[in-house]
């Protein structure tokens, strides 16, 4: 079962948000996965669709082929 990405609904799947996200009930709306304040993706963590979530000094690096992008040191 794939994790739920940022801003997508997590109704009935509160524990399935991707790493660094939590299920949050918005006022007058349904529950969505939102970033946990102060959280960032560490080196070599997958960052597909989360380019801005890498920790300081890292950037989301698109690997060749069909491999997923990862947070890598800024060169």
From Swiss-Prot:
Annotated organism of origin: Hadronyche infensa (Fraser island funnel-web spider)
Family: Belongs to the psalmotoxin-1 family. Double-knot toxin subfamily.
Entry comment, domain topic: The presence of a 'disulfide through disulfide knot' structurally defines this protein as a knottin. This toxin contains 2 'disulfide through disulfide knots' that are separated by a short linker.
Protein's UniProt keywords contain Repeat: yes
Predominant location category: secreted
Protein name stated in the entry: Pi-hexatoxin-Hi1a
UniProt keyword Repeat, yes or no: yes
Gene Ontology annotations for the cellular component aspect, listed alphabetically: extracellular region
């Amino acid at each position: 079962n794939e994790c739920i990405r940022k801003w997508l609904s997590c109704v009935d799947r509160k524990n399935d948000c991707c790493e660094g996200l939590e299920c949050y009930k918005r006022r007058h709306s349904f529950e969505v996965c939102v970033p946990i304040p102060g959280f960032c993706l560490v080196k070599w963590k997958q960052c597909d669709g989360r380019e801005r979530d890498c920790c300081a000094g890292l950037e989301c690096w698109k690997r060749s082929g069909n491999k997923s992008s990862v947070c890598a040191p800024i060169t």
